[in-house]
Amino acid sequence: EFRRVLFRSGDGFISTPTFDFGKLAISGSKQQYGLKKAADYYGNGTRNPYLRIKKTQPNWSLTAQLSQPKSATDSLPTATRLLLGAAPVSSFSNYNQPTELKNAVGTTSAISLNANNTATRIIANQQFTGSNIYQLDFTFNNVKLEVPANQGVKGQQYQAAITWNLVTGP
């Protein structure tokens, strides 16, 4: 899935990731499940999901929140978590030009989103500066869905949404 959200100011998301964990077993203990491996999904795990941001303001921050995973007839508890690990952050110069350069600028803290729609700070104001385009790479093998014990109904498909919030301004 490719979504592009840009605002009149030009600020917004150039690309947001989709996380698919495939079919999971119901377990009697808390479990962490990795992303599914498939040829048509991030190159069978050889490519990383990423979030790419465009912003024009020098002051900006990023938060994310995870909704409660739901199926047609069931919900996973709000104690369910999406673990993204620490994400390397890169900036771009000459973006979308033949001379484009991607530069490593740092790493986020380990990212953990609870499935309760609570905003979690990913990047603080002025944590990264000097560019208008940034990318967070989520290491494929570090992305996990943590499900509490005895949760889920066999045969159900659960979906949740990550809301990425780019805050810009003076």
Q: What is the meaning of each model-derived region?
A:
Residues 109-151:
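Amphipathic, heptad-repeat alpha-helical segments used for oligomerization and assembly
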Residues 100, 105-108, 112:
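Surface-exposed molecular-recognition determinants
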Residues 1-2, 14-16, 108, 123:
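N-terminal functional modules and adjacent low-complexity/disordered segments of proteins
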Residues 3-103, 135-170:
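N-terminal small/polar-rich segments of proteins
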